[in-house]
C-alpha cells in the first residue's frame, strides 16, 4: 500500500512540476523511474517531457541510451514504434542499473505494448488491426525473449496481409 502511494505521488509530481522533482534527492530515483514506466498516457507524457529536457534530471544518472527497436524495424508497415522502443529501452536499462529488473520487467513490457497501441489508435481504422497485430508481435517478443529482435519477417508479413484484406 505504501509503495502504491509513493508511486502515485511520484507520478503526480512528475506531471505537475518535473523540474521540482529533478531537484529532489537521487534516493527518489526508483520512485521517479516507476512513475515514468507505467502503462498510462500520463506516465508516457512525463517520461517523454523528461527525455526531451534531460538537464534537470542529470543528477539522477538515468541511462537514456537506446538501440531503438534492436534489430527489428522501427516502422514496420509504416507504424512508427521508435519512441515506444526508446521508452522500453529506458525502463530495461534503468531497472537493470538499480538491480530491480526482474521485479519490473513485466510492467515495462506492458508499458511498451500500451505505448504501441497508442501509436495504432492514431491510424485509420482500415489499418488499425494490422498495427495492433504488429504491436502484439513486438510485445510477445519482449515478453518472451526480452528483445524485439525475435520478431521475424513472417510476423510482419502476416500483419501486411491483414492490411491488404481490410
Task: Label every model-predicted segment.
Residues 8-17:
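Bacterial N-terminal signal peptides
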Residues 2-5, 20-166:
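Extended terminal accessory/targeting regions
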Amino acid at each position: 500500500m505504501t509503495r502504491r502511494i509513493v508511486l502515485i505521488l511520484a507520478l503526480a509530481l512528475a506531471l505537475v512540476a518535473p523540474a521540482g522533482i529533478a531537484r529532489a534527492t537521487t534516493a527518489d530515483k526508483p520512485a521517479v523511474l516507476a512513475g515514468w514506466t507505467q502503462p498510462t498516457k500520463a506516465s508516457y507524457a512525463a517520461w517523454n517531457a523528461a527525455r526531451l529536457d534531460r538537464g534537470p534530471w542529470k543528477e539522477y544518472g538515468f541511462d537514456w541510451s537506446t538501440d531503438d527497436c534492436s534489430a527489428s524495424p522501427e516502422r514496420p508497415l509504416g507504424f512508427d514504434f521508435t519512441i515506444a522502443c526508446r521508452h522500453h529501452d529506458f525502463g530495461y536499462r534503468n531497472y537493470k542499473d538499480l538491480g530491480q529488473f526482474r521485479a519490473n520487467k513485466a510492467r515495462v513490457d506492458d508499458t511498451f505494448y500500451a505505448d504501441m497501441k497508442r501509436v495504432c489508435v492514431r491510424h485509420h481504422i482500415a489499418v488499425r488491426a494490422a498495427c495492433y497485430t504488429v504491436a502484439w508481435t513486438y510485445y510477445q517478443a519482449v515478453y518472451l525473449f526480452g528483445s524485439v529482435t525475435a520478431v521475424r519477417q513472417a510476423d510482419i508479413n502476416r500483419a501486411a496481409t491483414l492490411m491488404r484484406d481490410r
